[in-house]
């Protein structure tokens, strides 16, 4: 199913000029540690495609002026916009199925998910995940994180609420296969070990939950810290070979490292309150965004020491990594409130590792 009418045509620039600019500037850019470019308002998550050699950024645009949002396709070297896909629903979360080259975007406000062909920019379909109408008593679950299992063409989406769930979507038919219930309060974090058939989620109850993707049943749930303090384990990223999960906490000044086989804590890494986390197996490093501190930390995953910190004001948000593990991308938000929106677009930063 194609829903092309929901989107405007792609932006087309001069390919020849673009090629010349990339060729002339590549050596200079490659030598720089950091490149920063303004892209669009409401920048959230990113997806990277080795096959398309492109980076996509989900943006929600203005709260007041724009009904929908825009997915930008960026040149991964220059960060120049090469395509703009206008969506009538605002996109927030993002992932890609590398096998099918399908982009998946969570439409948080509308409790939906949209699938887009990475090569053409055409919409392949859309699925409403929670059709309940919002009232004072009813709060539909909102999609947050998305992960794609390329082996089975299955998309897992965390549905966040007072009592969260995980939606399991067939990537071929774009239909709901099943819903994994009872994943706790504000269960945002989501990570997949496809070979082991294990899905992991974390929540504001301080739990680390293990799910069998063969049966879509919860195998175990463990409260990681019993220290009487508030914890919100907001995101996690896996070292599948080492059976480790790196877990961020938006309520505490530390990053946890957990053994995925038993939920035991392997390390507590001192760091500012954190948001996104991404493990890099090529360099055996983990990268963490610290929204309030305006920084990105580089953690040596062997020693568990913070070995480098990048200043990325104002609010570093999400992370993406090139397939070779040599380039890190960071989406950065400007200061904005409901009363006073940001006047400038949000940025994407390219860091040579």
From Swiss-Prot:
This is Uncharacterized protein YncE. It comes from Salmonella typhi. The keyword Transferase does not apply. SUPFAM superfamilies: C-terminal (heme d1) domain of cytochrome cd1-nitrite reductase. Residues 1-30 form the signal peptide. Pfam families: YNCE. It comes from the Bacteria. InterPro entries: Haem_d1_sf, Host-pathogen_enzymatic-act, WD40/YVTN_repeat-like_dom_sf, YNCE-like_beta-prop.
